[in-house]
Structure formats: C-alpha cells, structure tokens
Amino acid sequence: MARFTLPRDIYHGKGCLEELKNLKGTKAVLVVGGGSMKRQGFLDKAINYLKEGGMEVQLIEGVEPDPSVETVMKGAKVMQEFQPDWIVAMGGGSPIDAAKAMWAFYEYPNTKFEDLITPFGFPELRQKAKFAAIPSTSGTATEVTAFSVITDYNTGIKYPLADFNITPDVAIVDPELVEGLPVKQVAYTGMDALTHAIEAYVSTLHCPYTDPLALQAIEMVLAYLPASYNKNMAAREQMHYAQCLAGMAFSNALLGIVHSMAHKTGAAFSTGHIPHGCANAIYLPYVIRYNAKNPAAAERYAEIARRMGLEGICQQALINSLCEKIDEFNVRLNIPKTLKDFGIQEVEFKEKVAKIAELAVGDACTGSNPRAIDPANMEKLLTCTYYGTEVDF
C-alpha cells in the first residue's frame, strides 16, 4: 500500500503571511535563522500576526545553515519550558528542518537523536503542538515535506530524518519573502528544486499522484529560474510555487543518489562546506548518466526531455539534451561543473572518497534510486564528479 501525504492547508500568494493570525492556540514558538527575516521586517510581522490571533510568542533565533544536533536540543529545551501548542518555523530550509526535529524532542524529551534516524520510525506527534512552516527560499520545500536534515558536526555527516509525522500542518508560501534573496541563493535553491522534481519523477516510488507535480515543477523551473536569478520578481513568485510543487512530489515519491551524495559530502571536506543546492547541481547530470543505464529510468529521463521540448531523435539523444540543459543552467548560474572546480583539494578527496561512498550508499535516499549502486560504483561516480570524467559504467 502506498501513501500520499501533504499539509492540511497550503496558503499561497503575496501577503498570505497574514494567515498566521488565524491559527487557533494560546502559545507559539517562532523559530528563525540568521537574521534576514528580522532585517526585512517579516519577523516583526509574523510576531504581530500571532499576537493578533491571541497567542503568546517565544522566539528561537539564530539557527545556523545546516543545523546541528546541538541547536536542535537547545531549541527543544526552550519548547519544553514554554509549552507551546503551535511551532511556527520561518526562513530557509535550516530553521524549518531544525524546528521539525525540535518538535519531536519537545513532545518526547527522553528520545535520543539516534532513535530518529530510522526512516519513518518517529513516534506520533501532535500530542502537544501543531506545526506551521513559512519558507523564505525557493528550493528545499521543507514546508510541505516529511523530511528534515540535521548535521552531526562531530562526524561531518548530514542525517536526513524522514517521517510523515513531521509533515507540517500548515504551509504559508508567500512570495514576498523571497524578493530579497541573494542571487547565489536563488541559483542554489533553484537547482535544488529541479533536482527534487527530477529525482521524484524517476524514483522507484513515483506514482500517478506525484508524476504531474514533478513534471509541472520541472517545467516551471526551466521557464523561470534564469529570470529569477536576474531579479525578475514575477519569476521569483513562480519559482516559489515551483519548488513547493517539487516538494509535494518528492515527499511522497522520495529521492535518489544525487541527494545521497550531497548529504554525505556537504560537510566532509576541510576546504569548506558545499551548499546543498550547489552539490545537487554538480552531481545531477552525472547521476542521470549513471541511472540512464537502467531502461526504465532512461525512458523517464527521455520523457522529461520530451515534455520540456528538448531536441533528440532517439532516447539517448533526449537524455543527452537533458544533461546538456542542466550543464547550461549551471554555467548561467555560475555553479562549478566539478568538485575540483569547487575547490576541494585532490589529496583530501582521494583520502576520503571511499568512506564517503560507503556512507552515501547507506543514505536514506539511496533506496528509491532507480538503479542500484554499491560502494565501488559510488566511489567511481564521485570520482567522475571530481574530475569531470565520463560516466561509462
């Protein structure tokens, strides 16, 4: 039996942040990130709307990019002391992801982080609070998904948490929040959204409910991401909706090894963190070429190319056109082609690649990839992404 789960309510359109005043409760914890929501005035608006609805508000500020286990545990302690009946998370993927994990530890204080790593092994939530999510970037779609990514900086590993319990009750998708996004963030989050949609479409768990969402998201990203990058506000609004559609698709169809690789390389190298969307953008064309050795996956990649109007007289030509389109976008968005171009040192890459490959194969996203992979082939694939060599296996 398959399952298709979405938030109960998705509000969209300019100014829909105001819907916060219609949440029914007495206390709300508001979780935010590094300060952009405060600088742009959206944090004050959110607080005022919640108070207008009759709620007492407690802030948790300063959630870092790629939130840590420590940040989650500190936030959960604040929640345990305040006892909210609504958790409201506003910002990029990081504060929303962190708040989802805080939610679990708020409701179950004796749970250990290790207990939550098992996919779809969460205890029942909503015993104490409901959850509202307000994205300020156009990529992660965590406002509509059953996922959260938390980083253990002691090991350098990102852990994707997965359970339908952490799908928010309410998503508020207000495009006004993304009008001030820096162009680099537009690029990375936009390619993250494209990766979500493509991986969902070829996933082993795709279904008639997820396919239309994935295809529509792909079409919208290809149509609007370049203009969004060039600060066209109408395009940014459409990208905000596209990433949400992609999230609805992948939350139910799951993902693939592009994300497995990104999760396990993001914090692995001493030369610096690889932003998640940037890693996805680098890996995506290589993974398509690897997965396309599977006939079923090849046909679905070709179908994406057909739907997008790309050229190709045969299946392989269509797949090549799709990869070339992704390469073209990466160039236009100033995203490196390889890990070497990103700045990862060759000595360190060679030293760590075998272990990274082993961890990536064990990632929660690997199971729904359309073509099986073992550590040896994962190491070969990662090596291709480092040097930019052909995927011929």
Question: Predicted segment positions?
Answer:
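ATP/NTP phosphate-donor binding region
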Residues: 1-86, 339-340
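Glycine/threonine-rich beta-strand-loop-alpha-helix active-site module
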Residues: 70-176
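Glycine-rich phosphate/pyrophosphate-binding beta-alpha loops
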Residues: 139, 244-280, 363-368
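Carboxylate- and glycine-rich phosphate/diphosphate-binding segment that chelates Mg2+/Mn2+
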Residues: 147-253, 376
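Flexible, glycine/charged-enriched surface loops at secondary-structure junctions
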Residues: 204-213, 227-238, 253-258, 274-277, ...
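Gly/Pro-rich interdomain helix-loop hinge
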Residues: 268-271, 277-351, 391-392
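Short, amphipathic C-terminal "tail helix"
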Residues: 348-393
